[in-house]
A protein has these predicted regions:
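Polar, enzyme-active/binding microenvironments
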Residues: 1-327
Length: 327
């Protein structure tokens, strides 16, 4: 015969004080106050991140919401300016080796990689950042702009540049693999994507959005080949995004004007996740290695001139521990 515990589940823990690091949704009885409590939930929300030192669109960036680098972009003209962000304010750092726009970046603030872009022509330039200065790497095997770059924390030694556009064709389905010393041709993506975003690692990656042919699609990488991924809920052309293949975020872009929609990916499907504080497109000036948290600075907000110095942070909003009542 089944026991009561087998039928009804485990007993609720009785604790004299609330746990300091409870699991989301955890329930316990506080014996001191005589109350039943449930642990807080962390809900990612967007908030203002302050004013970026310069206005631009098609900038690039990498890092986290509390330790980021935002650099370059079309101001116009194209610029080489770079700034660090500490979660509160910006400070200048060493300029990027060449003015450009349309590149993408990935990695932590002290070990980031920026690749590609456009400056009077499509670029094979790619550079490492060590937290203080830039170093130029061997050129990419293919010039591209409007690409997505993935690699996460290992970007300087294991990265993939995804799709974009280049000099040989308006758009490309090619990718480029980087091992820390050289770039080689990688597995082609099923559909070309200009202005795409990417996240994850070279063994488990994701690309999302882009200008065409379908701005709602995503692509999944398994370490050797790309395949069609789940469809997003709204189009994200020239959007921002990144994270991991099991915890990604995509935000902003162009949909008959600048888009504020945000979506989270959990490894199986995309879910609508509220709106940005300010709608922006052309927003690769972002820091997303800890997706679904994110930081984005600059972009196009649809105003004239079509560029902005706004920055936005998407972090965890802590819902306080709640007392369970009958009301």
């Amino acid at each position: 015969m089944a026991t009561y515990k087998e039928i009804k589940g485990f007993n609720i823990k009785s604790l004299s004080t609330d746990p300091s690091t409870p699991l989301e949704g955890e329930i316990w009885f506080n014996s001191t106050s005589g109350t039943l409590k449930v642990a807080p939930l962390v809900v990612p929300v967007w908030a203002s991140g302050g004013t970026n030192p310069y206005t631009a669109y098609d900038a690039c960036g990498f890092g986290t919401p509390t330790a980021a680098v935002i650099c370059c972009g079309n101001s116009p003209p194209q610029i080489d300016t770079a700034n660090e962000y500490n979660g509160t304010s910006f400070s200048p750092t060493t300029a990027y080796p060449s003015p450009q726009s349309g590149a993408d970046g990935d990695g932590p603030q002290t070990a980031g990689l920026v690749a590609g872009g456009y400056s009077g022509g499509y670029l094979t330039l790619n550079c490492d950042y060590n937290g203080t200065a830039w170093s130029v790497n061997p050129v990419m095997n293919a010039a591209r702009s409007g690409l997505g770059l993935l690699g996460n924390t290992a970007a300087q030694t294991a990265a993939i540049a995804v799709s974009g556009e280049g000099p040989s064709a308006p758009v490309t389905t090619s990718t480029s693999d980087y091992d820390g010393s050289s770039w080689t041709a990688g597995a082609a993506v099923p559909t070309w994507k200009q202005g795409t975003s990417a996240g994850g690692t070279t063994s488990a990656g994701i690309a999302m959005g882009g200008t065409a042919p379908i701005a709602t699609n995503s692509l999944i990488y398994n370490g050797s080949s790309w395949s069609a991924g789940p469809t997003m809920n709204s189009p994200h052309q020239s959007a921002g995004g990144g994270g991991l293949a099991t915890a990604a975020v995509c935000f902003g872009g162009t949909t008959a004007g600048s888009n504020a929609a945000t979506e989270d990916y959990d490894g199986s499907s995309w879910g609508s996740a509220g709106n940005m504080a300010t709608a922006v497109s052309n927003c690769h000036g972002k820091a997303t290695i800890d997706g679904p948290t994110a930081f984005v600075a600059t972009g196009s907000d649809g105003s004239a001139p079509a560029r902005t110095d706004v920055s936005q942070v998407r972090g965890g909003f802590l819902v306080e521990t709640q007392t369970v009542t009958t009301s």
